[in-house]
Amino acid sequence: RAKGLLVGTEAGVEYHQTFRDKGMDRPLPVAFYDPTNPAARDYVWNKLKNNYFDLGVRVFWLDACEPELNPGHPSNLRFYAGKGLNVSNLYPRENARMIWEGMREQGEDEFLTLCRSAWAGQAKYGAAVWSGDIGPTWEALYTQVRAGQSIGIAGIPWWTSDIGGFHGGDASDPAYQELFARWFEFGAFCPLMRVHGHREPREDVASENPGGPNEIWSYGEEVADICSRYILLRETLRPYLTRVMDEASECGIPAMRALFLEFPEDGRCWSWDGEFLLGPDLLVSPITEAGSRTARVYLPRGARWRQLLIAPSRGDEDQEATASYMLGETFEGGSELTIDAPLECIPLFIRENTDLD
């Protein structure tokens, strides 16, 4: 405070927000450091270095880095960089910059920072974004398919969601097990794949109770088997994913792509937003409705597409098999198909002659 490193207000005092953490019997006022101030970034990084980096920590998860001002009145805020109404959206970017500058100063060249918020230009600081504390619902899963495409178009190529949603979800409930399986299948083809959530039975996030179990085996044998197969498939795709991530890093092209980015001449791709491409060649059509066992899929015009099937425990001798997937029938682009989508299968297609190895 005495160094002037905190977010201020037009009245000249620092901004305060009430917050309740574990071990507190009541909410207490907290202030926010001002990441637009280079001296503030240095101050916070030195705290992180002494307490985490020097003990071996190399990956940081930056929660609530908007910051979480409630209520937030940007016009009342004052930053080192200027008036809040003009610069407050820079907060998450400059916060990620704080980590980046500190890590680079320590000689670290390859690292990832996971953030809850982002602003234009943040990706250059090695920052990925997740979509925050979303509900464990089919509606939330539906919106994540669109959110991932939207943030990529906005210039943030590294994105993920909390598989299964964050606030709730009972691992013993068959209805939620279905949702978790479908979300896991979708998550396997997001730029980053991660499970996170505050499952039932749970208490307030400020309590000592971490919530219910949330490992893939917490959801029963069938779901655990499905998740294991998609983890294996994700690992099998590592060479392809590396090429896609390199392109995103070097060119800014998102890993998770709306169809029209690859097929701008196909008018249907501009409105068909329930599918996306992971990189240029892998088409993904997530199931986002409870009980659905078929899917309506559109294959963009200008390419031929071969169905990619998740492998069962033993490969089918009539199909080309790998450890994790099989290649099925080939279809012409411009086709709209209804295909089977049992619980263990997310509709997947690859461009003909694509090398996933």
Locate predicted features.
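Catalytic-domain carbohydrate-binding cleft regions of carbohydrate-active enzymes
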Residues: 1-346, 350-351
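Edge strands and adjacent loops of beta-rich recognition modules
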Residues: 269, 356-357
